[in-house]
C-alpha cells in the first residue's frame, strides 16, 4: 500500500465479503486449547477470520492462546501477551507470588481473590485489557470478548464491543451445587463461582452478544437476563479438514472414546464409567479411552474402583491434533455423556471423522448431534442404563455404525464448520460497527494500517510463564472449579506483539 493510499484510508485488497478488511481485537483470558473449548474457539475462529482477509490480534493471558500459521494469511494473525500472575499454573497451582512479581494493584487484587477462595481471572484480565485497549485507541474497528464478562470491559474500550457467551457459567455453578455432598463443599463452590454475579451484571449491559446455539441463547436470557434481541446465534463447528475419515486407520474392536476437560459433574463422565461396566457384560472387549486428565479421587475414580475398571479405562493427555484425530478414528463409537453443553465440540469433531456417536440430550447437544437414529443415538442425560444400551447396540451392529457415521459427517459439513462461523461473526461485527457509527469516530480512517506496536514495558521481576499441562485438547466451554493450566507457547512463527505497557496509568482500569 502506498503512502498516499494510507493517508486516504484505503486498503489494498478487500476482504472475502467484498468490504474493507477489519482490524479485530479478540480477547481471551484463558485461550490455550489444552484448557478447554474457549481456547479451541479462539484458535479456529482467529484463523478463519484471517483467511477471510481481516487482521486479527488475539490478546490473551496465561495459559496463552495457540494460534495457527498459514501462508495465505501471513501477517494478518498476531498474538499479544497480557500476562497475569499465572496463579493456577502447573505444577504449583494456587501459588503465592514472590514480592518482586507484583506490578500494580490489579496483581494484588488477583492474589487476594485467590486467597479468599474466589476465581479472579475474568475480573483482573478485563481490567488489564481495558488499560491496554485504551492505550491503543484507534487501532481496532471492533473488540471481540470471548466470555470474559468483566467489569473492565464496560464503557468505552476504544471500539464497538461484541461478546461471545458460550453458555452461562451459572449452569456449571448449579450443577456443582447439586452434586456437593457437604456444607463445606457447597460454601467452596459458592465462593469459587462468585465471579458469576459480576458476569450477570456485565452481560445485561452488553450491546451485542454472540452465542453458539439456540439452547445457549435461551439460557442466557433466563440465567443472565440479557434481552433476547441483543443475542445472535452463530454456530461454531469442527475443523473438517483435520477431523475427517481415514480408512487407513484401523478401528479397535470395543473401543469407545470420549473427551472430558475436567472432572466435574457437568461432563457426566461418572455415568459413562458406570455404563461401561454394564456394556462389558455383553461386550467383554469394550474399553474406554478418555481424552483428559485421570482423576486421583472423586466420583469417577471411585466408580472405576467399585466396578473393577482400572484396566478398561485409559486416560490420555497432551496429545497432538493428529494423534487426537487418529484416536477418534480408531474408536468404534464416540460418546458425549454430558449433563449439559452449550454446543459440544466433541460431538461435532467425532461426527466429522465419521465415527458414530452416542450422545445425551443435555443442553444444546441435540442441535449438534441431530435426531436419534438418523445421525446419532441419543439418550437422556444422567442415565447410565440408557447409555449402556445405546453403546451395546452400536458395538454390535456394524451396518448401523457405518450409516450413522456417514450421516453424522454430512451433517457437520452442511452446518458446523469454522469457515461458516467466521462468516457469521464478521456479519455481526459489521452490524455492531454500523450501530455505533452515531457515537462519533472511534479509530483512524478506514483502512489505515495499525500504527506500530507500543514499546514493550519492563518485564515483571520473576514473573512466571505458563508451565505444565493439565489434560489433552479439551472441548468444553465452561470454567470448572479448581486450577487450570496448560502449555503456554504457541507456534514459534506466530508474531507476539507488545506486552501490557507500564506507561499506561493503573487508574485507567477502574475509571
Regions found by a protein language model. Give the residues of each.
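A conserved catalytic-core segment of Leloir-type glycosyltransferases
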Residues: 2, 14-21, 59-127
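Conserved donor-binding/catalytic core segment of Leloir-type glycosyltransferases
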Residues: 249-276
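Short hydrophobic beta-strand element within catalytic cores of glycosyltransferases
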Residues: 356-359
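Nucleotide-activated donor-binding/catalytic signature segment of Leloir-type glycosyltransferases, i.e.
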Residues: 298-319
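Conserved acidic donor-binding segment of nucleotide-sugar-dependent glycosyltransferases
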Residues: 371-372, 376-384, 393-398
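Aromatic "clamp/platform" in nucleotide-sugar-dependent glycosyltransferases that forms part
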Residues: 339
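Acceptor-binding helix/loop patch of EC 2.4 sugar-transfer enzymes
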Residues: 92-117, 157-200
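Carbohydrate-associated surface elements
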Residues: 215, 237
